Amino acid sequence: MNIERADFVDRVKIFVKAGDGGNGCVSFRREKYVPKGGPDGGDGGNGGFVFLRANPSVSTLIEFVNKRKFMAENGKHGMGKKMKGRNGKDLFIDVPVGTVVKDAVTGEVIADLNEPGKIVCVARGGRGGRGNAHFATSIKQAPLIAERGEKGESRWLELELKILADVGLVGYPNVGKSSLISRISNARPKIANYPFTTLIPNLGVVKYDDFSFVVADIPGLIEGASEGVGLGNVFLRHVERCYLIAHVIDVSGYEREDPVRDYFVIREEMKKYSPFLLEKPEIVVANKIDLIGKEELEKILKRLRDATNREVIPVSAVTGEGIDLLVSKLASIVREMKVEKPERKEEKFVKPSPVWRRLPEKFHLEVVKEDEGYWVVEGENLRVWIERFDLNQRDARLMLLQVLEKNGLNNKLKEAGVKEGDVVRIGDFEFEYRE
């Protein structure tokens, strides 16, 4: 997988908004020879949901650089003859496999889309409002009331791509990681004799007998990466999913003087990023052995083994010496770890229910004086009622006033000092107070 730096984006923020539910309809049956037909207002359709879907054909998050807002379709309003409005179309947003989805405000991890086809709902659509056919009773046979649709959910999300690879190559810049991955796999990264040639992670598939695994070439780290020196440690997140870390060390002495020090500097930067990385299995790859004498090489390899307490495999990415042993070792470790990993049970995706807030029967009311002779009735749960119904509809007003009276509205108005003739506002509806 070769991607230009400008095309590789592994962290973005996007805004998602699910569709609102359609409004219910106030309608009455009108047919020839049926002079007084009953209510037949249909329900509104549900708003569309927003889903994220892991798509293996998507490699980076670059599609979200220029487009950051995604909105699903609203539900259609209900109609007469008990016709339900059409549901809004769900919106599916494809992201790379390995994308971690977080709430951008709280930082909560919503989902880890680490398998092809995995889906997560990130915003639920609002339920459609009920038409007046639902409000008919033996006493009220022609109700002038219908519900508004519920608002769909909205939120800011942070998408973070963590590449899925079995082996992660880490080390200083210019130690030969790119040459190594091009030697052992089908990857063909840019290779040059200067630091930071690799600016993005490169992936390569390695085949060993009947077994294959994926290796990631992580851009070089240097001392101070955790403070943003060089390319920083922004790419270390791609190592988090690897089974095995292959720590590449330049033992030639031409560009790096002390391979043991180099090893521990990189380990310290990994620790600062996440101590969890130090718990991963690791082998040390001593590269560029073609540039050093055999006797000197043996001394360096012994120092590395004694200091790191790791298996050290000497190789030359240029001549190919030691490559077969390295591939065999990597394949053996990865194969063993994949067998040990318990099989995941396939999770069947179930679409959640649309947003629908239950109307509270009892709630606190507050009467606020806005001007001389002008008062406003407020309350958190009162707002839910006001959003649910159109108070221009006669029966909606009567129903709400009955609920408010049960919650002591009249006493609240008197306690606040409302006088006869004063104007009281509830939502967008105003009325003149009478004792």
UniProtKB/Swiss-Prot annotation:
Cofactor dependence is on: Mg(2+)
Q: Where does Mg(2+) bind?
A: 178, 198
Looking at the record, the residues that make up the OCT domain are 357-435
Record EC number? 3.6.5.-
Q: Which domain of life is it from?
A: Bacteria
Keywords noted in UniProt: Cytoplasm, GTP-binding, Hydrolase, Magnesium, Metal-binding, Nucleotide-binding
A GO molecular function annotation here is: GTPase activity
Q: Where in the cell is it found?
A: Cytoplasm
Q: Which regions span the lipid bilayer?
A: none
Residue positions annotated to bind GTP are: 171-178, 196-200, 217-220, 287-290, 316-318
Q: Does the keyword Magnesium apply?
A: yes
Record-stated family: Belongs to the TRAFAC class OBG-HflX-like GTPase superfamily. OBG GTPase family.
> What's the protein name?
GTPase Obg
